[in-house]
Amino acid sequence: MEKNQLILSVKDLNIKFNLRGKVLHAIRGIDLDIYHGEVLAIVGESGSGKSVFTKSFMGLLDANGSITSGTIDYYGADDGKPIRLSDLKKEKDWLKVRGHEIAMIMQDPMTSLNPLKTIGDQIMEAVELHQGLKGAAAREKTLEYLRDVGIADPEVRFKQYPHEFSGGMRQRVVIAIAVACNPQILICDEPTTALDVTIQAQILELLKEMRVKYNLTIILITHDLGVVANIADRVAVMYAGDIVEIGTSDEIYYDPRHPYTWALLSSICLLYTSDAAD
């Protein structure tokens, strides 16, 4: 798929949840087009609907939630045929999408890793399932992913367990697993929240590198506008289940239009690099 081609299109999407007899309208008529190769940041405070919105792309809504109207169309499939994600109901259909087409990195890497399996086995499982490699070929590919995400001594680390890794290293492993699935779209849900500032910057830089090397489209979910200044091509600002403003990073940072965007910007202190200022 060529850069800047439409890869995902959301039209008038509405999602509701039944909560003890009451209806919560979580997503309110969102329209959004996402293009191959871009990094789109979705920014908003906790409870604004960011995670609910993107989980709907993978059929991961809680049992009491559902898409009540609107469409989600995916255009990145190998056969070139669009897939209407909003119409998928069966788990077997979603299994064709999850991982291979759209993968997700969660906020806490420990919830994504099996504490009873070695790091190498967990990455290799994704390689075997989504790339069809076996044995020595799968192992060598796994070592390659460990190197790509910046983990030193991959042959040694291959045999170690999650508790033997720091938080930043675990997040690198989770990124390796996601990329090993060969996805077109990588959703990163608050991937740096649990990390200190220095490690945050390293993980964001790694995501930029993975985007280029593996030809990914990245959707970055965060409550902090400060972490997206030097990674996002576009920024969508969410408030109360709707996208209230969308634009390039420069437009959002230097010429915000919506009062909520102003409020988010006023809550952070940014040190702009010369590249960002240019």
Model-derived regions, located:
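A short, proline-enriched helix->beta-strand linker immediately N-terminal to the Walker B motif
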Residues: 180-184
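A short, surface-exposed alpha-helical micro-motif characterized by mixed small hydrophobic
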Residues: 228-230
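Short catalytic/signature loops enriched in Gly
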Residues: 4-6, 81-85, 152-156, 248-274
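Short, glycine/charged-rich "phosphate-handling" switch motifs in NTP-dependent
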Residues: 234, 246
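The feature captures the beta-strand-to-loop junction immediately N-terminal to the Walker
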Residues: 43-44
